[in-house]
Amino acid sequence: MIIKPKIRGFICTTTHPVGCEANVKEQIELIKAKGKIANGPKKVLVVGSSSGYGLSSRITSAFGSDAATIGVFFEKPSSETKPGTAGWYNTAAFDKFAKAEGLYSKSINCDAFSHQAKQQVIELIKQDLGQIDMVVYSLASPVRKMPDTGEVIRSSLKPIGQTYTATAVDTNKNTIIDTSVEPATEQEIADTVTVMGGQDWELWMSALSEAGVLADNCKTVAYSYIGTELTWPIYWHGALGKAKMDLDRAAHALDSKLFATGGSANVAVLKSVVTQASSAIPVMPLYIAMVFKKMRQEGLHEGCIEQIYRLFSERLYRVDGQAPAVDSENRLRLDDWELREEIQQHCRDLWPLVTTENLSELTDYNEYKEEFLKLFGFGIDGIDYEAEVDPNVTFDVIEL
C-alpha cells in the first residue's frame, strides 16, 4: 500500500515501515560515530523499548556497548487495512540491524505491567543470558491493568488544586490558542501515581532479584522529566509530577537494596524531546518549539539518542569509573543544558509574544512538526513516499 500521514488529535494514525527503519538506522549510525562506551553494560533489559528514550537506550546499549538486549513493549503489527504501530517497525528494524552485527536481540510484545511479562523475561534471561547487569525502565503508558485484579486504572494529565490556563499551540490547525485544563480529583491523582509511578519498576526489580537474574553490579535507571515553572502547573506540580515523585521514592528504595551487591538505582531526569508521549501533554509542544530553537542556536540541542549516549558515557559508565554526579535527590540530571538560566529566560520572555502569525518565525514549530511526523516514519529524506510498501513486517518477537 501507499502510506501517507493521517493525524488525529496528537497522534498520527498511520506509520511508514521504511521511514521507521531509516530513523533507527540514523540513531545507530550516530552511536557508532560517537564511539564505544568503555565500561558499558553487556546484558540489558529495557522495559518500554519501542520508541523514545527506551528505544534509544536499547540502541545505545547494543551499538555503543555490544550488549545483548531484551526489549519489552506493547505494539501492534499491521492488519489487512492498516499499517502497524511505529514501535513495531522500530523494533523490527532494531532486531534486524542488531542480528546483522551478531548481537543478541530478543523482543517481547506484551503488557509490561503483567506478572506473565516478568516471568517470560526471567525465563529468557535464565535460558540465554544467565544474569543481566542493566535494567532500563522507560514505560510511558496512559493505562495500567492491575496484575492481580485485572482492574484497569487510567492516568490524568491534569493540574492540582486549580484550573490551569495557558497559551498553547493547536498542532492540527497550527494556531496559538488559550487552553484550560480542569484540576485532577484526589482519585485521579492517586490513579496517575498507580499508572506512572514507581510501583511497577519495583515489581520488576523484585521479580528479577528473587529469580536470581540480577548480576552483582546491576544498575537500574528510570526516566523522568521535571522541567521549569513554565510547565510545572501541568507537569511537575500536576498529577503527573506526583507520579514522577513516586518514581523518586522507588529509586531510593531500590538503590538501598542494590547497594549491598555493588549495584545502583537512579532516576535520570531528561530534557524535553519530541515523542509520542510529550505531544500529548498540553503546552509541551509550544514549549519544545521555543526551547529547541534557542538550544539549537546555542549549539546545545540534543534528541533522545544524544541524551542517552551522554547518560551512559558521562554518568552511568564513566571512563574513570567514578560515581556519577547526582542532585540532592540522587537523580542523574541530563536536563542541565535545557535548564541553563539564559535558555529559560529566553522562553519566559518569548511565551507572551508568540502569536499564530509569528509562531514559525519565533520558534522551531515547523521543525517540531517535522520531528513529530518523523516519529511515525514520514518526511525523511531519500524515501519515496509515493512508492508501494509492504506494511507486513515480521521479526523475531515473542507474543504474549
Curated annotation (Swiss-Prot):
Signal peptide: none
Biochemical pathway: Lipid metabolism; fatty acid biosynthesis
EC number: 1.3.1.9
Catalytic site: Y235 (proton donor)
EC class name: oxidoreductase
Family: Belongs to the TER reductase family.
Annotated function: Involved in the final reduction of the elongation cycle of fatty acid synthesis (FAS II). Catalyzes the reduction of a carbon-carbon double bond in an enoyl moiety that is covalently linked to an acyl carrier protein (ACP).
NCBIfam families registered for this protein in UniProt: EnoyACPredFabV, PRK13656.1
Protein known as: Enoyl-[acyl-carrier-protein] reductase [NADH]
